[in-house]
């Protein structure tokens, strides 16, 4: 099975020529040598502004000519070109723009320079990290099923609703693997009776942990379970990540073939929209925030043998976990720290860019920010207590990839500095960049152009231009304190569980998640108005230097305002009235009349159709049936999934214009299993996760402006915090007898599977 790729655009003649040149024997060495010479020249050659403008124009032309190519060498060339232009900008900043008249100017100017150095450092690290994505393909398993390993599937849960967890458990029980070689465990922090009962009903195994208050949260839960299980491998699924049936068959091959691989990570795909997708006007046409990491960065990490463990949707070798004493408990991001510790011991990690599970995205901006605060705290903790640049066991590539991941969470402070810098002049008259507009055009604009344009080429449809700025700005003012406190006191902070599942019956504005940016934007607007007043009313009284400074800082303030307003727009929470998220799916089905009770099962009045979307609540089908608007009609829906037949009872609510809407008749556990299989378990369910157009920066900027416009529509009420209603527990189901294990009363020796 291979990943479905979007159609490759036809290359132009110039693109083919540039690819041929870069593919010639020895071309890579020539390009590398030329690039090194150019980088040296960038730090030594002095040019006046006019000469620099010519160089900048030539570099832009080179970008457009070479950028027509689609090869990997083309991308590397563009990254080297971008690095050259950025180093040229850095040289200019260090040598010609630090002419300060007062000590206040000096302090503010150095602060801005430090933020720029951080941004350039992250830019160069990202180029290194993604220079050669591995694009690993699945490996087949041994032909003899007897040679397949045993697997324990861990589903840890703390305070999540059973209605969410049960779908993951049923999906895991349906994974296509020899029944005597797989066990599914609910790891319950807190021993809740309804979870134990559900395990008995569905045939899963249950491990409850009573004393969880000071027991290292999720990492402690996993370590508690490791001591009570024995499978060769452990598949970890967050309690909302529902696997496809093919998960293990797709992802296990590399683990069996290479005994040095300790981890096989797969993408975290979400079937529900994140707050940015749901709340912004063009969000649904924009890739999810996490796609950049799972589509580009992790593939780059894999080349350097530096794939991170992301806490879920991953297979781990038990031997490797036991070799480091279990999951890391020193930080609140046990996943990345565990991978780092395994790699220090010589284990390899791997990444497969095929989504084989899907979960719920954070559904409210408040919870999204809270989750990112935990990630930032955890990665900074690792930076402090187990810095990848120190200690033994890691190769240089691994050190740099981990360093990039950890220091990327320092973004909050530089982001605030970039946004606020024009206020230094607009409010206090402190010009912290001593440069004429021509110099800015010659040095700064080319640096910005190449950074944005090269990122668009590298990221393609995984992340759109300017959206990283919006993501960071949304969270920056909340993360500043977390960053500083964790750097100074890495032991502070605790694990928090991300709340998921629920509805929002009315459109609301989340003031609690946006008030810092609202205050920030108000101050920025004040500064912009002052600058415009000076330019319009007092223009003739200003000297040339003052006019240039006001023009530069007003333009800067306007850019900051655009980003701030886009971040504020995310707080406009749109209605979410469905408990069950609909998923687009095109599945051939046969719809037929449900037989009366006691009657033989026959395909009476069978009609073929194609599903439009599916959910745990029902399905929409395009089907040539006469219009039905008078009431519910009992039907059955038949499909063939991955070579196996499935048949689900449903009620047709209506049929108009060839589209029929059904609700599932979900009255027993077996039916619920089939629905989970139909909606989430298909091997090809999520292969279109990257089905987004390639990035075009101007189009991306326009989409942000449309989102800002939508912020001011007259609808919705202001709220201090967003609390979605919880989904009620699912219907009671038939009972089945399993084995139950509680902390402190573990059955010694063996754990048997319940009858299914």
UniProtKB/Swiss-Prot annotation:
Segments crossing the lipid bilayer: 27-47, 49-69, 106-126, 167-187, 409-429, 432-452, 470-490, 517-537, 551-571
Catalytic activity: [(1->4)-beta-D-glucosyl](n) + UDP-alpha-D-glucose = [(1->4)-beta-D-glucosyl](n+1) + UDP + H(+)
Binding annotation for substrate: 238, 240
Cofactor(s) needed for function: Mg(2+)
Region (Catalytic subdomain A): 147-242
Region ranges (Catalytic subdomain B): 319-379
Protein name: Cellulose synthase catalytic subunit [UDP-forming]
Phylogenetic lineage: Bacteria, Pseudomonadati, Pseudomonadota, Alphaproteobacteria, Acetobacterales
Gene name, Swiss-Prot/TrEMBL: bcsA
